[in-house]
């Protein structure tokens, strides 16, 4: 094929598809090398966190024991875990398996929730047993109770540098950051928070789909890109933004800001000056600016502070566990939204005809649809509303997510983080 013609065709496809095409085009002898190098673009780590996985698999043995305690047929059929007395069974299991890989993390996590959050032992262990065997639909559908507690604490530590704002974050557990992105774009549009032709700002470099999705015919947002093109006196790239570009956020025509922080690529955090400037703009010039921040790489940056820590009222945060724990295959992420937030306020202030449309949309879920939080609307929208009763991330995925969070919370010497 003509080289120039090939280049022209390649310009129109996504970088991820381009990577696959380049691998296919490589000579057989070069394919392994090409795949190793090019797959880095997907952000797929070449390590795993072992302790949370050891705890997960050990908990699986306990879960099966509890099921067989209720019923154990030779055909390979067992019962489902019962709540009453299950904590005492778990404590006995830990004592019997105290030297098994994962036992220490399970015991520490159990004690953490009992001591720090006054968890009822039977309720906690019953949630864990059902989660590890995956015998039920997720209830609550947004995120399991004890998973949410662990992940809330984890986000306060990692996204807020242990200085979270007042109030609590509501969390929605999703099938990785990619699902979170889809749910956010869909629900922003379904709830009239972003409409075709609305102005949004993308801070680039960014994860490529954030650039591609707004161009789809369904959305057709008016996109302004601001580029991290600041240089130092020696002409070196700082991967930071000019004040002039940041000031474009002052326009009320800009409805939303999408930011990947740290950037992806090249993994630079926003400078404190830029962060402070955006916070000032939101407070003084454009108070209705919605901020959607993807902070998956924040755990690799010392003392990281997300927009969810600095201006929680305006911020919707996506965090994925995939990169830090070597877990892209687990599809573990959360959407975090403060209990008091701009998104709920904007929905409440919609024109009457739009509020009536939304009332009809969510009327099968509650007698007062107008009071339904935006984050709960996202859960319903993720399953076309009608399937809301079966919404939610699978129980085993949530169990592993909770153990990932607990592992980081209980690593008081930050040995894992320092190795990263």
Question: Where in this protein do the model-derived segments appear?
Answer:
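Walker B catalytic acidic pair
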Residues: 294-295
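Short, flexible/disordered intra-domain loops and linkers
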Residues: 9-13, 48-56, 135-139, 230-240, ...
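N-terminal "arm"/small-domain region of PLP-dependent enzymes with the aminotransferase-like
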Residues: 2-142, 391
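Structural motif of enzymes handling amino- and sulfur-group chemistry
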Residues: 354-420
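Short coil/turn segments at secondary-structure boundaries
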Residues: 51-55, 214-215, 331
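Active-site PLP attachment segment
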Residues: 46, 299-300, 307-363
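Conserved core of the PLP fold type I
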Residues: 77-287, 298-312, 316
